[in-house]
Amino acid sequence: MIQQVSMEIMEFVETQILPKYTEFGESHGLRHVNRVIKNSLELARITGADINMVYVVAAYHDLGMSGPRAIHHITSGKILMADARLKRWFSQDQIKIMKEAVEDHRASSSRQPRSIYGKIVAEADRDIDTHEIFLRAILYAKENNPGKNKEQIWELFAHHMDEKYSVHGYIKLWIPNSPNEKELKMLRDIIEDKAVLRQEFDKIYESIL
C-alpha cells in the first residue's frame, strides 16, 4: 500500500489548487484546508484508502466557497469533475468517486457519505479541536457580519455551537474510534456550561482583534 502522496500530484495541488483558498477568508482559507489535508492523510493510513485520492479530495473540498456557501460542497464537486488535469493521474471512475466524496463532506448533511473517501474528508473536515472550532466560528461570524458588535457575535457563536456541536446538534461522525470522538465529548462538556463557553469565547475574541 502506498503511504506517501505522489510528488507530482502534490506539486500540482500546491501550485495550482491551494493558492485559490487565499480568496476565502480565514475561516475557510489555507490554514483550514491544510488541516483537513493533514487529518485526511492520517485517516487514509488508518483505513487503507488510496492516499492520492484522499489528498485530492481534501484539497478540492472547499473550492466551491467561491460561490454560495449553502451549495459549496456541490460546486466543489463540479470543479473537481471538470478539472481535466486530474486525468493525468486518475481514471474516470476514480474522478467520479472523488467528486462524490467532495459533495458528501458537508457537516449538515444527514446522509451517510457514499464511499470511504467521503467519510474520510467529512471526518477530517470536522477537525474537532476545541480551540480551532471556536476560532473558526468566531472568524466566520466576524467575516460575514462586519457591522455586529461583540455581544451580537457571541449570540451567533453560541447559537452555532448549540445547533452544530451539542448533544442534539446536527454534526455526525462517520469513522468509528476516530480522534474526533473523544474531542467531541470534551467540546460538548464546554458547550453545556455556558459560563465556560463564554470564557473561551472572550479569550479568543480578544486575541483576534
Language-model features: locations:
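Short alpha-helical hairpin
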Residues: 1-19
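Divalent metal-dependent phosphate-bond-processing catalytic cores, especially two-metal-ion Mg2+/Mn2+ enzymes
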Residues: 22-49, 60, 110-209
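His-Asp-centered metal-binding catalytic motifs of divalent-metal-dependent phosphohydrolases/nucleases
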Residues: 51-68, 72-76, 97-106
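Short, well-structured alpha-helical segments
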Residues: 30, 34-37, 55, 92-103
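An active-site-proximal "capping" alpha-helix that borders the catalytic cofactor pocket
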Residues: 36, 71-86
